[in-house]
């Protein structure tokens, strides 16, 4: 199953400035020749790969990018100032196509790699360029050329930063729906989630991470029971594991340990990943709920219904995600089954 983030934006490079119609006006020079300067170039638009970016989420909030036009030429042969260039930063590995022709424009894979995608219009020539022996006082200049404009279609194979692990009905789908814009199927019965759902969690502007709601695990998953190996293959690709146990579980500590044991049976290396334990559904927790003591693992208690603890969880997830190197990510591009 391929997980692809996509966005479409409009870009408009700046138009070139007009050339100037002007004549020298100096003392003792009653009939000065043409001295109109050229217009400035319109601003270019560049794409730049940035390894700190993980998703295309910010392009859902800003859809248009307009570079400024070049300034018009002036007298005394002064050329107008060039328009300001725009640099649009995108995650490494983003495929960029012309939305109309679907032609591949860019595939920037290295951090800092840049590409010019829309050229600003050339500035028009001033009237100084049009003087001839028979026409010594030309009264016209060129307009600036239009900047390039089109729509860009961007696609990015997502890297899962955070994997949600838990038995069916632990509240994984509900959590991902309140932290992100994902709309997974949610119902009060086991195995509602049959394929991984991905949600993009926006932490701050230009800061986001990807959360994978993995299908519910059951005891024996490492041997292939339930969704078994289909589930565990996707867990391998995440950087941080969040182990969820519902507050109404019969024995929270035992359920947590069972989940950890299933991970260890499949691949003991999974236990080397950063891990957070989360007790969900605190809105229905009983007064005599026993909070387990988990050595070496941060434990948070949340309610996706009331919002209790969600900010603390989001802060902790971002803290851990931002310390992990994105260079070790693997695209989520395998098929289930």
UniProtKB/Swiss-Prot annotation:
GO terms for cellular component: cytoplasm. Keywords: Cytoplasm, GTP-binding, Hydrolase, Magnesium, Metal-binding, Nucleotide-binding. Pfam families: GTP1_OBG (PF01018), MMR_HSR1 (PF01926). Its main location: cytoplasm. Its EC number is 3.6.5.-. Residues 160-322 form the OBG-type G domain. Its cofactor is Mg(2+). One of its GO terms (molecular function) is GTPase activity. It is found in: Cytoplasm. Residues 1-159 form the Obg domain. CDD domains: Obg. An essential GTPase which binds GTP, GDP and possibly (p)ppGpp with moderate affinity, with high nucleotide exchange rates and a fairly low GTP hydrolysis rate. Plays a role in control of the cell cycle, stress response, ribosome biogenesis and in those bacteria that undergo differentiation, in morphogenesis control. Belongs to the TRAFAC class OBG-HflX-like GTPase superfamily. OBG GTPase family. This is GTPase Obg. It comes from Chlorobium phaeobacteroides (strain DSM 266 / SMG 266 / 2430). The lineage of its organism: Bacteria, Pseudomonadati, Chlorobiota, Chlorobiia, Chlorobiales.
């Amino acid at each position: 199953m391929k997980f692809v983030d996509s966005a479409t934006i409009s870009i408009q490079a700046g138009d070139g400035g007009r050339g100037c119609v002007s004549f020298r006006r100096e003392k003792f020079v009653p009939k000065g020749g043409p001295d109109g300067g050229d217009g400035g170039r319109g601003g270019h638009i560049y794409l730049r790969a940035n390894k700190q970016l993980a998703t295309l989420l910010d392009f859902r909030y800003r859809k248009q990018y307009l570079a400024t036009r070049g300034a018009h030429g002036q007298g005394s042969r002064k050329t107008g100032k060039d328009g300001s260039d725009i640099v649009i930063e995108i995650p490494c590995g983003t495929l960029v196509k012309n939305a109309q022709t679907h032609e591949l424009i860019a595939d920037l894979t290295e951090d800092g790699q840049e590409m010019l995608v829309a050229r600003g219009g050339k500035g028009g020539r001033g009237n100084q360029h049009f003087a001839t022996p028979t026409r010594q006082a030309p009264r016209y200049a060129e307009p600036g050329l239009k900047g390039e404009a089109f729509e860009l279609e961007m696609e990015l194979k997502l890297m899962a930063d955070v994997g949600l692990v838990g038995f069916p009905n632990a509240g994984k789908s509900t959590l991902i729906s309140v932290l992100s814009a994902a709309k997974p199927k949610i119902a009060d019965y086991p195995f509602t989630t049959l394929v991984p759902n991905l949600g993009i969690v926006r932490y701050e502007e230009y800061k986001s991470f990807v959360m994978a709601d993995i299908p519910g695990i059951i005891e024996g998953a490492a041997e292939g029971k339930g969704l078994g190996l289909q589930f565990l293959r996707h867990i391998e690709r995440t950087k941080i594991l969040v182990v969820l146990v519902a507050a109404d579980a019969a024995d929270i500590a035992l359920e947590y340990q069972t989940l950890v044991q299933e991970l260890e049976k499949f691949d003991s290396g999974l236990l080397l990943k950063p891990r957070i334990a989360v007790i969900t559904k605190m809105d229905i927790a009983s007064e005599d709920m026993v909070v387990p003591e988990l050595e070496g693992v941060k434990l948070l208690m949340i309610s996706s219904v009331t919002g209790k603890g969600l900010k603390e969880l989001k802060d902790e997830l971002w803290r851990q995600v931002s310390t992990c190197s994105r260079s070790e990510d693997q695209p989520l591009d395998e098929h289930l089954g």
